[in-house]
Amino acid sequence: MRLAFVSPLPPAPTGIADYTVDVVRALNGPHSVELFHDQTNVAEALPAPAFPVAELPVRAAASAFDGVVYQMGNAPAHDFMYGWMERVRGVVVLHDLVLHHSFARRYLESREALAYAADPSDPGRKVEADRAHQSFLSAIEAVYPGLGERLKDAHFNTTGDLLPYAFPLFEPALRSARAVGAHNAFMIEAIQEARPDLDCVRLAMPVPLPSLAEGTAAAFRAKHGLAEAHWVVGCFGLVTREKRIETVARAVARIAEVHPDVRLLLAGPVSDNVWLGDLLARTRVSGRAVVTGRLDDREFAAAIAAADAVVHLRYPTARETSAALLRVMAQGRPVIVSDIANQAEIPDDVVRRVDPIDEEGGLVRSLEFLRRHPEEAVAMGGRARRFVETSHSLARTLETYERLLKPPAPR
């Protein structure tokens, strides 16, 4: 098949950009893929030719695509897709069930709304901004009747920032979809309930099993000031509040009172450097924390190998399946995760789970267990690697994507 993938691409600040590259590598050979983006620059070493998304209709007219695939998430890097999903129909791979923030930005951060915010004394700009806000209300009311005003208020910080997670607003992204794919059973069930008319396919994640040279972990530790004797707690991927970094930092601080050799490794792009710096200082772990920023694939794998235990918490959650978590598991590291519904399909003997109600206490106990029982940590990591190898291989990715892209059955 000749396929068009519409997606953010590296170095866009979303893990889905890297995911898209891995999927294309899995599809290359049996299929021909072209990439379409909305960025001023993209990485040079991509596995398929890349074009500005404005060229999609022209290239489709010159030689029809067998399928157009939209890689849709909640981050700002995906916002450009809304208009294109309606203009050029295709299948939608939904990475986040919660698209409320993304959809709201179409209106609340529109050109008209921003112009009014810059000059609220201009009555003409107010009229245009009100029109954009009214369009947002109408769109919400179409999905959640009677809740438009309340949900709009949430975006102006009058009702708190958690409310949008209870009203995911993913339906507009599927309005013109031919089919939809997602990566976990929780999302599949929610999508099928909202859109029983759509073919919905559960997709595997393309998670390669890296083979690292001997000494890779030691070299990474030496480069970043981590001694062999240090017990390293790692968090991987985009560093955000939702990853519960403050909880992790507090847990590390508590453990350090008894075990001063503990260190915290944060490997990945940082969403807000000021917030993170203040947090590490306030929790008294600045002197035992290493923050790497964005790493290339080789360095990211080395960072994972350098961790003795990995923490991957989420709250609130957009119900996504985390590629960073699966990459950690693929390298056989022992992982502690939040006990949330969209991760229920990960077997209990593969990870340790933390109840969000007792998040910090549960995390401290789990870290202490892994520290006291290194043999069980190694065994758990081995089970994690086998789970990823079975459930999220490149071959499984190819198989599930081909199922998504096949012509829909008559209804």
Enumerate the language-model features and the residues they cover.
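A short, well-ordered alpha-helix in the C-terminal region of glycosyltransferases
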Residues: 238, 376-390, 397, 403
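A short, active-site helix/loop in glycosyltransferases that binds the activated sugar's phosphate group
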Residues: 101-102, 160-200, 207-209, 345
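Short hydrophobic beta-strand element within catalytic cores of glycosyltransferases
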Residues: 310, 330-337
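Glycosyltransferase donor-sugar binding loop
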Residues: 40-41, 236, 263-277
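Conserved donor-binding/catalytic core segment of Leloir-type glycosyltransferases
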Residues: 227-243, 249-252, 265
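A short helix/loop element that forms part of the nucleotide-sugar donor recognition site in Leloir-type
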Residues: 212-226
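Nucleotide-activated donor-binding/catalytic signature segment of Leloir-type glycosyltransferases, i.e.
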Residues: 276-301
